[in-house]
UniProtKB/Swiss-Prot annotation:
Paired cysteines (S-S): none
Gene Ontology BP annotations: photosynthesis
Annotated compartments: Cellular thylakoid membrane
Chief location of this protein within or outside the cell: membrane
Membrane-crossing segments per the record: 10-30
Keywords: Membrane, Photosynthesis, Photosystem I, Thylakoid, Transmembrane, Transmembrane helix
Gene this chain is encoded by: psaJ
Protein name: Photosystem I reaction center subunit IX
Amino acid sequence: MNNQSPLLKFLTTAPVITTIWLFITAGILIEFNRFFPDLLFHPLP
């Protein structure tokens, strides 16, 4: 009846998905800031 593996059931829980999503978002921001520095900071005129 339940043929889903325990690892797949664990990986589809909300805290795990949220943690993975935050790591991906942080990685994108870090790499963007590495290749294009100072674009994330806009000083006031």
